[in-house]
Swiss-Prot record:
Residues 139-160 are annotated as: Disordered. GO terms for cellular component: HslUV protease complex. It comes from Sodalis glossinidius (strain morsitans). The gene is hslU. Signal peptide: none annotated. It comes from the Bacteria. Belongs to the ClpX chaperone family. HslU subfamily. ATPase subunit of a proteasome-like degradation complex; this subunit has chaperone activity. The binding of ATP and its subsequent hydrolysis by HslU are essential for unfolding of protein substrates subsequently hydrolyzed by HslV. HslU recognizes the N-terminal part of its protein substrates and unfolds these before they are guided to HslV for hydrolysis. This is ATP-dependent protease ATPase subunit HslU. Pfam families: AAA (PF00004), AAA_2 (PF07724). ATP binds at residues 18, 60-65, 256, 321, 393. InterPro entries: AAA+_ATPase, ATP-dep_Clp_protease_ClpX, ATPase_AAA_core, Clp_ATPase_C, HslU, P-loop_NTPase. It is found in: Cytoplasm.
Amino acid sequence: MSEMTPREIVSELDGYIVGQHNAKRAVAIALRNRWRRMQLDEALRHEVTPKNILMIGPTGVGKTEIARRLAKLANAPFIKVEATKFTEVGYVGKEVDSIIRDLTDAAVKMVRLQSIEQNRFRAEELAEERVLDVLIPPAKNNWGQPEESGEPSSARQNFRKKLREGQLDEKEIEINLAAAPMGVEIMAPPGMEEMTNQLQSMFKNLAGQKQKPRKIKIKEAMKLLVEEEAAKLVNPEELKEKAIEAVEQHGIVFIDEIDKICKRDEVSGLDVSREGVQRDLLPLVEGCTVSTKHGMVKTDHILFIASGAFQVSSPSDLIPELQGRLPIRVELEALTTEDFERILTEPSASLTTQYIALMATEGVSITFTEDGIKRIAEAAWQVNECTENIGARRLHTVLERLMEDISYDASEWNGKTISIDADYVHGHLDELVSDEDLSRFIL
């Protein structure tokens, strides 16, 4: 669980997302409250429930990006789902309980990686011994079993030194490695994924773990052996217990496109499952117990963050019970020309930085001038206003169109410097931007 303060979390998010300070503050406080709750006495800790968040804002302003970055900062079980993928029980589609099952699977994977990392030093020692056993087989007694000697031989110690110094990395050896289990593909109807997973696990267990001889270089063998030995040191039952505890105490679920499951008054019949999805979500958000293949998981203290554009609906179109379980509301502002300029320059992996790096691989030096960036931002904003407002995603379309000629002829521009200034942008984009019909279909 991350111990970063809200201010540190916001500062970290600022490196990737421009503006939207209120949304960043809300998720930062919610994440910090997870840590604060764990410092309380157990009796009071159980009573403190997470304050779920509803993020409201037009498409392309950073709602999903905040979730992606939060997942990396949280160091906790995290899953992002699309509300449109789910239907109520009885309809074709995934049931909402699969959210918690997927979250638990993610937690098991996360805890397993942490356990392997903790056991890495011991695993490296065991892997080293297995490689040395191949290079210098131990002496055997009359019954064909390895003799137990107190001190390793000088030859073994010499090879150990060479192995650690990397002198034997390119030497090939034949060693027994765990064979990958035979995959069993099972075609199941939508909504039956859990049964499919259980059947695949059953077949995998029936097959057992087999050893297969492979001839590979020592450097690669060490990597594979370390992973194999580290996996053996992990206790599966203890791993499941830790994963379930991590989900129950620190789990975060991000539900995107929640506005798409709002019931619309003018639509009936085909719209019937929308409200059903909301009602199925209620127990999860309020707190219930979900059965997973790893065990029973309580959702009482899982943090839910929902987001939606709400362009053809409003948050009040959600059923009242679900509205009440999303008490913190954050509105994200539409992006301005100034925001577009900042998006093109401020983030650590901004679009301009990406294009400069991509063209550098062909030996082409690209520079973006201030007036060029300003004109790109104005063009993106203008197209958004005239056609459909898709927020910052419009910059991808505009820049790709702008860089098309350079990308196509990059090999011929090797060793040259190209400056993307206002005149260059005018020449390549003005005709498209000024013609609304062309903008609609090309940009």
